Amino acid sequence: IANGFKKACKEYKISIIGGDTNEGKEIVFNVCIFGNSNKIVTRKGSNKGDAIFTTGPFGYTSLGLDILLKNNRIKKNLIKKSLKAVTNPKPRLDYGLKNKKYFTSAMDSSDGLSTTLNEMSKQSKKKFIINKIPSNKDLEIYLKKQKMDLNSAVFHGGEEYEFVFTIPLKYKKIIIKNAKLLKIPIIEIGYVTIGKGVH
């Protein structure tokens, strides 16, 4: 555990300045991080006409947890992707820091994509129209064979630690270009309009 903390601190250039321990039957970690920012991107800044993007794809954490709990036999490359999504998630911090000046609103997806989209819609007082499911073909094929629900895996999985963000249309080219430079997949999943809720 200590080595894991050390590795994460080195990778994300942060320091542990304190902590407290207690006794219990389960292992629980609560972490709080403080930092400075010259621009804070909130959950509530989206505007009518903004595009909705995610880094991604989604759904592998649901499958990874299913593999761990049920010991399912699937293709090796799909196992690797899914287990990595659960046991070693990688927040897209470089991408977020490089592009936050273009975002009108943003939130991480650790509580699930559906929860994130609904929270951003509520905070912005705007309707979010979702017209694309941010998943990969290999995942879709497997879930279909297993008669598992794609929407549930993608929108209600959680623990992906991806960025969900809105941008004015004029910045689409630059954020896509920056994603390619950093080799980070991003997916346009919808748009913002007048109204309430996620549709």
Region spans (language model):
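Helix-biased detector of long, well-ordered alpha-helical tracts
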Residues: 1-199
